[in-house]
Amino acid sequence: MIEISHVDKWYGPNFQALKDCTTSVAKGEVVVVCGPSGSGKSTLIKCVNALEPIQGGDIILDGIKVNDPRTNLPKLRARVGMVFQHFELFPHLRIIENLCLAQEKVLGRSHDEAVAKGSKLLDRVGLTDHAQKYPAELSGGQQQRVAIARALAMDPIAMLFDEPTSALDPEMISEVLDVMVDLAREGMTMMVVTHEMGFASKVAHRVIFMDQGEIVEDALRADFFGKPRSDRAQKFLSKILSH
């Protein structure tokens, strides 16, 4: 589904954000990417759907080479859901309108079809009663659940999450993670950048640990939490799990 091969990413001539990164995400697999701040994990996930260009290597998404200049990136991005740290909802649109816009403009669905799909997804994330509200009327956790529903409305082949809970108050985190756990258990292909090790230990098939732009460890969940191979991963886990 997602193939990342020897990827390099530079910001200017002096800072290399990603260094020879190679990994993959199979169909139906949940892969968590973790690591300290500045390790390159958010950069990596943004490169998957070309929100950030790469300077070396290849990224293949469902058989399509992302970094090929001939690739229709808007069309490709429409097939991959992306949920950001900050919810990126349109503040001037009601919640149901946020869910309908891309369905109508990108997928060509009728307004009635889009509303039906959006309403079904709002029910799925527990927000049916908020369809006619504006984003500012919702809590951060509710807005993030709307963002997930909006991504799902496009019937994505995979979902990318870039620290989806890091901007939330602690009491709101679980409501977002619960939706993500349900998605994982339904077989959605997911690549998730997060510090939520409870989520990773519950649903991740594999865990990738990054540091200083490198993939230091790429292991099965049980191996990563049971006996990480690298000193850097061991120190990271001991620090995270001690809080």
Predicted regions and their residues:
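ABC family nucleotide-binding domain
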Residues: M1-R221
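C-terminal boundary and immediately downstream tail of ABC-type ATPase nucleotide-binding domains
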Residues: V216, A222-H243
